[in-house]
Each structure stands twice: as structure tokens, then as C-alpha cells.
Amino acid sequence: MSASAQVTSIREINHDCSGEEWEARLDLAAAYRLGARLGWHDMLGNHFSLRVPGTKNQYLLNPLGLFFEEITASSLVKMDTEGNVLSDAPHGINKAGEVIHGGIYAARPDVASVMHLHSSAGAGVSAQTDGLLPISQNALILMDRIRYHEYEGPASDADDERRRLARDLSDGSILFLRNHGTLTAGSTMGETFVLMGRVERACEIQLAAQAGSAVHYPTQDAIDRTRAVGAKMYGSNSRSPGASLEWAAFRRKLDREDPGYAV
């Protein structure tokens, strides 16, 4: 029997888990299962998190020792932004996850969710001098949201890096961690997930284009107009605030094909 199949629902063992927290756990567990399907895992590395609704300094994170495909709503660990583990975590948590996520939640009360990946495409572009280039529509719609953070070594070895990560993310929602990977931060789990999907696609397109002949750049007018559209994407007045339409579709797909996350 898998580790995830042995997990008892937290609703049965912890009466302090509110309905709002349970829904947040379902969202985050779904993100992990979907991430596994998209190949976003890196052994036991990479981590997604979601702020506990109604709190200022608590968030949910994956426990150390489970693959993305094994994560369930009940297996998620509750943390606070000071690095304290507030729920059971038999194997602990990924220290780098606490450094990266905790610092952003402490500095950005508007952020509800954070995702961090080491994908080949994202890490590859993070190692390029010019970073993500304005050479595809996928990249252009993200440009106004992107920031960069210089590589300092493993995040788990530098607790004070959390402040510099938050500083470099600033008011952005996409952070390229140089020579390391990518990070997205959004107002909902859906927005954070969909932004990461768009970052991944933009990076894949860039690497594919660079592998061929000379890269063609759009006109400056086309660049400016597309960036303006992207800056408003998923805003409160958009067709899909917080990427709600996309996320609902992802959740329906997972409920059909892999409902085991919801325990």
C-alpha cells in the first residue's frame, strides 16, 4: 500500500481543521498531483505552498519523503513564517522550502500561494545571461511580472536568503532564481499554478527557438501591446480572475482521473 493510501483524513483526526483550511488542502494537494502529471517533480525536491485561509503567518507545505504523486490533502504540513512546524511531519520538511516560501509570505500579504521548480527548461533559461527573452507570445504576456534573484548556493544553507528572495521578487509574481530554477507567486492556487505553466511553456519555446536558426524578435509595438495585455491577465476585471476558469478545469480533470488526492 502506498504512503498516500495509508493517510487518514485530517478531518477525522484534527477537529481544528476548518472547512476553509480543508478546501485549501484540497487545492494544494491537487496542484502536486497535477505537477506530477506534468513532470514538474525533481526527485523529492521542488515545493508548492498555500497560505492557510484567515491567517497571516501560516501556510501549508509538502512533507519531506513523498513524491508529488503521493501527496494528499491530509499529508500536507502546516508551517508558520518563523519556520515552526505546526502539524505532524514524520520526516520533517525541506529546509529550502521553508526558507523560500516563509520569506515571501512574511513580506507579501497579498500572496496566497507559491510554487518553486527546478525544471530543465526553467533552470536552463535561469542560467542564460539575458534570462527570458521577448521572443514568443507566451513570454511577452509574462514580462511585466518577471524578476531575477542571483544564485547564492543552496537556500537551505542561508536562512537570511529568505529576505533577499522576498526583496528581489518585490511586487512581481515570477522569479527566476539564477542557475537554479523558477518561482511563481499568486493570489490563488490556480493563478500560481497557471503562471508556472505559462513560464514553463515560454522557457521551452525559447530553448527550442535557440536550438534552430537565428531568433526572430517581434516589433517593439507588438511587444508593448502584448505586455500590456499580459499585465492585466487574471486581474479582478479579467475573464478569469485569479485564473479561476483554468484552475476549475484542472480540478475537474484530476477529480475524473486521480481522485485519491482528496483524503
Tell me the role of every PLM-derived stretch:
Residues M1-V263:
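Glycine-rich flexible loops
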